[in-house]
């Protein structure tokens, strides 16, 4: 329905306008705060919000653990839907692998400046971006395809992975590259034998984050997949409106367990890399 699509586009523009207004207010407050700089005398005083912040930081993991135990108690023996589990695993693994390749190519060959637009998916509302992707997929007759859903996930996976890899890439010691070139190494050999091993731990972290970001995607999966590519997230949201409690708990528990297992494996691999390669600690 064209009228409904126009209403959706108008709602997306309204969200963008609200975000722009909030950004202007925050920028004005920051500029106003800079006019009243504190008296920097080198004397430290206890921060009044330190204790509440520490308590909140301690309670957040505990609340997540309690939520996982509650889901495990509700799920009991209800198995997850295998097609949703397979789609979630396939999309997440493919998205983080392609995202890592895109990020490494961007860092190695991309422009040094003018890349601020890469971070837009991290600050803009998800609805306008997903709506734009959906319209492109409709115009190209690609909606309902698995690879289209993967493309939709990459819009959010790549910025998050680049957010982790970019600082580590910039902190590389350029003297190692100079020494390697004096020994006659080419760019390809330097990348595979010198640069990539030095990025082992941040690359593993980026892969885990990209995996979890892909698992959590709902709007791109639903719209670009046209409802024909079920995942754990889409099934959990659908069941939350009136499904069986045990099945909903099982879907949500698997949605929690998959990123947890991925983070555990990457932490173990990072520990092994630091154990057998002291320079990567």
Where are these regions (language model features)?
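Short alpha-helical segment that forms part of, or immediately flanks, the ligand-binding pocket
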Residues: 118, 177-178
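Short glycine/proline-centered loop/turn elements that form peptide/ligand docking sites
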Residues: 172-176
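Intracellular loop-helix junctions on the cytosolic face of multi-pass helical membrane proteins
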Residues: 29-53
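Membrane-water interface segments at the C-terminal ends of transmembrane alpha-helices
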Residues: 8-27, 49-170, 194, 198-219, ...
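Conserved adenine-binding aromatic site and its adjacent loop/helix in ATP-hydrolyzing domains
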Residues: 87, 178, 234, 238
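Short helix-to-coil transition segments within interhelical loops
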Residues: 178-199
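Short cytosolic juxtamembrane segments of multi-pass membrane proteins
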Residues: 35-43, 270-281
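Glycine-rich helix-loop "coupling/hinge" segments at transmembrane-helix boundaries
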Residues: 1-3, 216-246
